[in-house]
Amino acid sequence: MKKIDVKILDPRVRKEFPLPTYATSGSAGLDLRACLDDAVELAPGDTTLVPTGLAIHIADPSLAAMMLPRSGLGHKHGIVLGNLVGLIDSDYQGQLMISVWNRGQDSFTIQPGERIAQMIFVPVVQAEFNLVEDFDATDRGEGGFGHSGRQ
């Protein structure tokens, strides 16, 4: 298992709020918790930034982290990420903040310590552009959205 440096920024982490862990041996994502002093109520359509109390430094440029919504919160309550997906670059060292958006119909209260997002680590390839006049022909060509049909 790859080791990622983590710094605890809020003393309640590990005392009141556990460090992120994988829920099962097959889990892809680590659950991130709301490191809040008080509950935060999100009205429909509202967004807020929620601290995690943690900073990570991936250091390896062949890796990045992605923050994703938790499926139950999104499906049952309309709570998703305000930026849809959060990308954490390998050289970022600041606090992990979660942009939370209530796209649901009802207000939702985020409780201190509540699991509100998940983080996965993904491989990264840094590519360099090769300037060309034309591309080699493919079956698809320039076919865009809906090109392959629905059936």
UniProtKB/Swiss-Prot annotation:
The keyword Lipoprotein does not apply. Keywords: Hydrolase, Magnesium, Metal-binding, Nucleotide metabolism. Its EC number is 3.6.1.23. Substrate binds at residues 70-72, 83, 87-89, 97. InterPro entries: dUTPase, dUTPase-like, dUTPase-like_sf, dUTPase_trimeric. This is Deoxyuridine 5'-triphosphate nucleotidohydrolase. PANTHER family: DEOXYURIDINE 5'-TRIPHOSPHATE NUCLEOTIDOHYDROLASE. Belongs to the dUTPase family. The gene is dut. One of its GO terms (biological process) is dUTP catabolic process. This enzyme is involved in nucleotide metabolism: it produces dUMP, the immediate precursor of thymidine nucleotides and it decreases the intracellular concentration of dUTP so that uracil cannot be incorporated into DNA. Its cofactor is Mg(2+). Pathway: Pyrimidine metabolism; dUMP biosynthesis; dUMP from dCTP (dUTP route): step 2/2. It comes from Shigella flexneri serotype 5b (strain 8401). It comes from the Bacteria. It catalyses: dUTP + H2O = dUMP + diphosphate + H(+). GO terms for molecular function: dUTP diphosphatase activity; magnesium ion binding.
